[in-house]
């Protein structure tokens, strides 16, 4: 999926490019792309580190969204097909 398509699908309003939902969707696309890359190149340690960084950023954004707007958080994780955060 292209970046523009993701932004259009998850934007809150027409000129929205940086809302939490859009950021999470873009990071999820990067996670999927990097995961596919690492299946073929499992010793690419720089990409593994990058994947862990992206996952951490996405986790922080999801945590923020779950506290700020739980309804849109639930909708977003179901739409993206990702697991909910563990409650500690």
UniProtKB/Swiss-Prot annotation:
GO BP, one annotated term: translation
One function term, GO molecular function aspect: structural constituent of ribosome
Pfam families associated with the record: Ribosomal_S15
GO cellular component: a single term: cytosolic small ribosomal subunit
Family statement drawn from the similarity comment of this UniProt entry: Belongs to the universal ribosomal protein uS15 family.
Compartment(s): Plastid, Chloroplast
Organism per entry: Chlorokybus atmophyticus
Gene: rps15
Gene3D superfamilies in alphabetical order: 6.10.250.3130, S15/NS1, RNA-binding
PANTHER family recorded: RIBOSOMAL PROTEIN S15, BACTERIAL AND ORGANELLAR, SMALL RIBOSOMAL SUBUNIT PROTEIN US15M
InterPro entries: Ribosomal_uS15 (IPR000589), Ribosomal_uS15_bac-type (IPR005290), uS15_NS1_RNA-bd_sf (IPR009068)
Stored SUPFAM superfamilies: S15/NS1 RNA-binding domain
Record-linked NCBIfam families: S15_bact
Entry keywords, A to Z: Chloroplast, Plastid, Ribonucleoprotein, Ribosomal protein
Subunit and partners: Part of the 30S ribosomal subunit.
Protein name, UniProt field: Small ribosomal subunit protein uS15c
């Amino acid at each position: 999926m292209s970046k523009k398509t993701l932004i259009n699908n998850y934007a809150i309003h027409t000129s929205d490019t940086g809302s939490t939902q859009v950021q999470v969707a873009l990071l999820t696309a990067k996670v999927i792309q990097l995961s596919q890359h690492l299946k073929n190149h499992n010793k690419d340690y720089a990409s593994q580190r990058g994947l862990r960084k992206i996952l951490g950023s996405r986790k922080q954004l999801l945590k923020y969204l779950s506290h700020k707007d739980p309804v849109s958080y639930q909708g977003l994780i179901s739409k993206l097909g990702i697991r909910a955060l563990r409650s500690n």
